[in-house]
Amino acid sequence: MTDTTAPRTSGAVAAGLATIAADGTVLDTWFPAPELSDEPGPSGTERLTAEQAAELLGGGATAAVGPDARRGVEVVAVRTVISSLDEKPVDTHDVYLRLHLLSHRLVKPHGQSLDGIFAHLANVAWTSLGPVAVDDIEKVRLNARAEGLHLQVTSIDKFPRMTDYVAPKGVRIADADRVRLGAHLSAGTTVMHEGFVNFNAGTLGTSMVEGRISAGVVVGDGSDIGGGASTMGTLSGGGNVRIVIGERCLVGAEAGVGIALGDECVVEAGLYVTAGTRVTMPDGQVVKARELSGASNILFRRNSVTGTVEARPNNAVWGGLNEILHSHN
């Protein structure tokens, strides 16, 4: 069964560059090299001098900091400390450091507290020139046109795309817009064009992602989330049940799961198994799918004659991942 526990040290520390709007709102913070630490010190963020920034981030940091008149922001160098990852985030810099820890694969999903993060994240216009305050978009667009530039707004959201901050080794991402910062992608993972990975979610091994991995969902090694498939997350509707897809599982195209799957499970294409789905067992007994949550070696299928959802021993091998698609990431 997929191990979702995340051994880690108590806290974290990192130096980075933060974008500050004219009203003082922190739009983002980029931490190029976050680290876990046993004794990080008290939680908080301090601004760095130019000399400190050059020492901790490299010589290029000196040129990167300062006012950006085009976007109406200031870029500042900071050092953020989290004394304990079990404690909830205290500010925007803290949240961004935790998201970086996930995408740098230093912490697994659910391996730290993310309580209250939405309150610390501003709604930001993510553009081709960098993060911009939403109220300033048209002003920045005009500034760009005045310089012969075209401003492209890729999204207006609280979370940026991961690849603008972290590019994990050994993965393929066909459409970067569909992977949020805070996604955890293990080496060998391929995310195709229709795949999506939310924050505090992702893969723990080689996986094919052609469907949606919702917030809080973890997918085990060797599993395939088929085209258009869905996994129920822990955000919408106040859900708090963690969905774990075990190892060597197949969630077929346009299928979905609202329960945990053990290892070697298959959900046939087009079948959505929610916790309340009534499932007929091999002996004729009818149970709710939640009673099978986490069980291994099960084939979930819909009887094409009666329409009944059935659970059968998964004696057949679905073939596994195509090694050619994952061995050269």
UniProtKB/Swiss-Prot annotation:
Succinyl-CoA binds at residues 212, 227, 230, 253, 268-269, 276, 288, 301-304. It is found in: Cytoplasm. Pathway: Amino-acid biosynthesis; L-lysine biosynthesis via DAP pathway; LL-2,6-diaminopimelate from (S)-tetrahydrodipicolinate (succinylase route): step 1/3. The active site is at residue 210. Keywords: Acyltransferase, Amino-acid biosynthesis, Cytoplasm, Diaminopimelate biosynthesis, Lysine biosynthesis, Magnesium, Metal-binding, Transferase. SUPFAM superfamilies: Trimeric LpxA-like enzymes (SSF51161). Mg(2+) 2 binds at residue 194. Its EC number is 2.3.1.117. Homotrimer. Belongs to the type 2 tetrahydrodipicolinate N-succinyltransferase family. This is 2,3,4,5-tetrahydropyridine-2,6-dicarboxylate N-succinyltransferase. The gene is dapD.
